[in-house]
From Swiss-Prot:
Induction profile: Up-regulated by wounding. Expression peaks 6 hours after wonding, decreasing afterward.
Signal peptide region: none
Modes of activity regulation: Inhibited by magnesium, calcium, cobalt, zinc and copper.
Recorded catalytic activity of this chain's protein: benzyl alcohol + benzoyl-CoA = benzyl benzoate + CoA
Keyword vocabulary terms for this entry: Acyltransferase, Transferase
Tissue/organ expression: Highly expressed in stigma. Detected in stamens, sepals, petals and style. Bearly expressed in leaves.
Entry protein name: Benzyl alcohol O-benzoyltransferase
Pfam family of the protein (one): Transferase
Residues of the active site: H166, D380
Length: 456
């Protein structure tokens, strides 16, 4: 069965509740790191997990009750998630560990897992019903830091959906919490990986010493694409055939040293740039999220669940990007990623404090986050691993439409690959799909028609 975006169903929700830690936890104030309270992380990010009811030992268990108890027990260890965010002098964010709890919704849907189709991928039908935006709950300050909805399906399967205040954790961090919930739900006494706060590691130096030219945070005048009310959401699957087609267009000296993600990113950057039709003389940016945990000496602790990534930017003009071979974009991306070191992370923290915690550049910017190894699909609440686990949609963020994710997926033929949800204005989406199709089929792209002739 194919992915059915036209699927419609009813969801019956119970009244939202707050789940508090199962035991009393300390009331204290914990500062976020100076990397975390930047403007570009002050938004809510949605995650969704689909679970098949095929475990006979769990036949009589209610996933809502099992997960509710798992959350309460996990919050004893991850108690800052049960608190509320406050802002103090200098726009500094601090968690007040109040123990108020995370928001939880119990729900039932009159649909089966099979009706979603064999290829579960964003955008998901009726998503706003599977992760309900409780009025008044979505603020960055003074609001629940997590909202979780568990929806039973009429076939016995269920959906776990979560909304995270991104200032609190990155993909690796929220997966640690979700795995802890799963372990506690399955009866563990403690999480296998104990959480570590240690946000001071990523604090600014005194005085701040910005040692890199952080082009990802440059102030650029201009506008990003509009209108926001005409954004289209689509997903594209990349298996071995598609990746091989891209690699054939790369110079031999880059084929062996470039990762699949880097090759894919170079291709998508060009296609998306053609789609948004900037002036060829305008700068365009490709921001790649780089997990910096291993860049430190010693590496950050395994249980560190805060944001620990950099967003280096590859920068060139639209004309150069689209008129040069794919290897040109690839080398820019690889060079930007190589910049990320421990010193680079300290420099980012220093920049945040010195310049008022700015948003990253969004004009003519595309940002991709690779969650293929984050472990969303491995989260097990007792019913086995998720049949889909990961970000719920592309285009999330303070500025809609800038961000995409690389998500692991097995397609209808059973082939493992990567799915990319992307968000663009409807007209731009058609151009993107055409450019991508031409690239994968080795067809020449008519660059000139995507730019104004007078500017070429």
């Amino acid at each position: 069965m194919a992915h059915d975006q036209s699927l419609s169903f009813e969801v019956c929700r119970r009244k939202p509740e707050l789940i508090r830690p199962a035991k009393q936890t300390p009331h204290e104030f914990k500062k976020l790191s100076d990397v975390e309270d930047q403007e570009g992380l002050r938004f809510q990010i949605p995650v969704i997990q689909f679970y098949k009811h095929n475990n006979e030992s769990m036949q009589e268990r209610d996933p809502v009750q099992v997960i509710r108890e798992g959350i309460a027990r996990a919050l004893v260890y991850y108690y800052p998630f049960a608190g509320r965010l406050r802002e103090v002098d200098g726009r500094k964010l601090v968690v007040e560990c109040t123990g108020e709890g995370v928001m939880f919704i119990e729900a039932d849907a009159d649909v089966t897992l099979e009706q979603f189709g064999d290829a579960l991928q964003p955008p998901f039908p009726c998503f706003d019903q599977l992760l309900f935006d409780v009025p008044g709950s979505g603020g960055i300050l003074d609001s629940p830091l997590l909202l979780i909805q568990v929806t039973r399906l009429k076939c016995g399967s269920f959906i776990f959906a979560l909304r995270l205040n991104h200032t609190m954790a990155d993909a690796a961090g929220i997966v640690l919490f979700m795995k802890a919930v799963g372990e506690m739900a399955r009866g563990a006494a403690t999480p296998s990986t104990l959480p570590v706060w240690d946000r001071h590691i990523l604090n600014a130096r005194v005085p701040p010493q910005v040692t890199f030219n952080h082009r990802e945070y440059e102030e650029v005048k201009g506008t990003i694409f509009t209108p926001f009310d005409d954004l289209a959401h689509r997903s594209f699957f990349f298996g071995s055939t598609e990746i091989s087609a891209m690699r054939k267009q790369i110079p031999p000296h880059l084929r062996s040293c470039s990762t699949t993600i880097e090759v894919l990113t170079a291709c998508l950057w060009r296609c998306r740039t053609l789609a948004i039709k900037p002036n060829p003389d305008e700068e365009v940016r490709m921001i790649c999220i780089v997990n910096a945990r291993s860049k430190f000496n010693p590496p950050l602790p395994d249980g560190y669940y805060g944001n620990a990534f950099a967003i280096p930017a590859a920068v060139t003009t639209a004309g150069k990007l689209c008129n040069n071979p794919l290897g040109f974009a690839l080398e820019l991306i690889r060079k930007a990623k190589r910049e990320v070191t421990e010193e680079y992370m300290h420099s980012v923290a220093d920049l945040m404090v010195a310049t008022g915690r700015p948003h990253f550049t969004v004009v003519n910017t595309y940002l991709v986050s690779d969650v293929t190894r984050a472990g969303f699909g491995e989260v097990d609440f007792g019913w086995g691993e998720a049949v889909y686990g990961g970000p719920a949609k592309g285009g999330v963020g303070v500025i809609p439409g800038v961000t995409s994710f690389y998500i692991p997926l097995r397609n209808r033929q059973g082939e493992k690959g990567i799915v990319l949800p992307i968000c663009l204005p409807s007209a731009a989406m058609e151009i993107f799909a055409e450019a991508l199709n031409n690239t994968l089929n080795g067809k020449e792209i008519e660059i000139a028609k995507h730019f104004t002739q007078s500017s070429l």
